[in-house]
Amino acid sequence: MYHDVSYLLSRLINGPLSLRQIYFASSNGPVPDLAYQVDFPRLEIVLEGEFVDTGAGATLVPGDVLYVPAGGWNFPQWQAPATTFSVLFGKQQLGFSVVQWDGKQYQNLAKQHVARRGPRIGSFLLQTLNEMQMQPQEQQTARLIVASLLSHCRDLLGSQIQTASRSQALFEAIRDYIDERYASALTRESVAQAFYISPNYLSHLFQKTGAIGFNEYLNHTRLEHAKTLLKGYDLKVKEVAHACGFVDSNYFCRLFRKNTERSPSEYRRQYHSQLTEKPTTPE
């Protein structure tokens, strides 16, 4: 098999290497000593052979995809030769690797990186895939999301990296600043001061470059982290709110319901009830 990254992406998106079952790795419970665990989300795709993965609780065969959320883990048990294609979604770049287990040792067949630039298409697709963990039986939808994510990866590989304009570069720097400090008491004024610009220019920058308001982006970032805490930790709603930068837990609950049509407690219960449902067989 030819192991060029762009070639593999095209074959997975358009065939003949069609996507089969989408599995979701564990993000709860004790992590085995030899398990793979990183702080960024990733996809593990089987190209050839098969193996048992403890994190997925299943035997993966060619075309199967294992989605490992940020902080999640997987633990492949190699019993026969197999080849996998991994995509790591780092904050600043994507990492691609093709690894083969020949029965005795690992061999790296391909490795490539590309910068994550421009609109946050990949980030929103990953958020959608995180939500799919609540409904793993919806396999057709999960396959379409993964295919879209792989298509986005191929677009990044195929595009010419252009130097960002000054306003675009500033917007991305501010966005990263918010992503790292969302739990702090951020305001439009404090963020503007950190970058030596006026609050009005900050608002203009978000509307023009990001097509989203500053407060809207800040709240969205905090709510996404709140969802992660609600799903993975047994914290009180008030503790989740404060951990994500919301001073007023009542405001957090109103905002959460407005964005999800569920209260934080309902969201947590639905997530855990979905996890207990047995996934259906591949369509």
From Swiss-Prot:
The keyword Transcription regulation applies. SUPFAM superfamilies: Homeodomain-like (SSF46689). The keyword Transit peptide does not apply. GO terms for molecular function: DNA-binding transcription factor activity; sequence-specific DNA binding. Residues 172-270 form the HTH araC/xylS-type domain. Signal peptide: none annotated. Pfam families: HTH_18. Residues 189-210, 237-260 bind DNA. Keywords: DNA-binding, Transcription, Transcription regulation. It comes from the Bacteria. This is Uncharacterized HTH-type transcriptional regulator YijO. It comes from Escherichia coli (strain K12). The lineage of its organism: Bacteria, Pseudomonadati, Pseudomonadota, Gammaproteobacteria, Enterobacterales. The gene is yijO.
